């Protein structure tokens, strides 16, 4: 993503008052808009025009759909609907902040390993296998995965694989982020290969990921999950996650 061609700036009185970044995912003809404005301009005509400009930019890049995410407490929902968006999905923001991490019980035919700098293709393969076809997911290349795994909020030891003697069967991609002066663990992606679903492996890789992040963070562990994904929500609740907020994904169709 080139900020010079993908970031739109809103100016008021010769000062920057907001921005809209357009992330293009050409493989699935999607654009994701990340926007923020000065608090007194939220839901204003100025913000609406900024978002409309972002949509125009997305259209020039052959996007067929655009998505934008909002938190639960915001006056901007009605503004987005006026622009032409509709609420497509709701995600739960869940937090684990138990004193004792759950036990990781690994069957003898499986093992847990940590990501290394040589594992970009391995991580690419399991992530694409686990999520291709899922709502909002754009398949990755090994180059993209390598870049993301070396970002400042990611440590290699936060990325955990579950394997048997033949395959990588699942993974948990964790990262770290600041939260009110502390460090919070974040489970950004967790998935099981389609060939190994229904075997109870999700809980194994989840608890392994929690334990690793718990060693490195001091302010709990958070994740986002589709509110329609009842099995995943029950799994997270079973190890101590609780809902703390909701995120709403809005969709615009060109």
Residue ranges and their predicted role:
Residues 1, 20-28, 136-183, 190:
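A conserved beta-strand-loop-helix scaffold within acyl/acetyltransferase catalytic domains
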Residues 1-52, 56, 172-183:
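Conserved donor-binding loop and adjoining core beta-sheet/short helix segment
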Residues 34-42, 71, 193, 197, ...:
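Residue-level recognition of the GNAT/N-acetyltransferase active site
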Residues 37-108, 250-252:
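Acyl-donor-binding surface of acyltransferase catalytic domains
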Residues 43-56, 189-192, 198-215, 233-238:
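Conserved acetyl-CoA-binding loop-helix of GNAT-fold acetyltransferases
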Residues 66-70, 187, 221-225:
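Conserved hydrophobic beta-strand within the GNAT/NAT acetyltransferase core sheet
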Residues 71-89, 203, 227-245:
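Conserved active-site alpha-helix within GNAT-family acetyltransferase domains
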Residues 111-125:
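A short beta-loop-alpha structural element at the N-terminal edge
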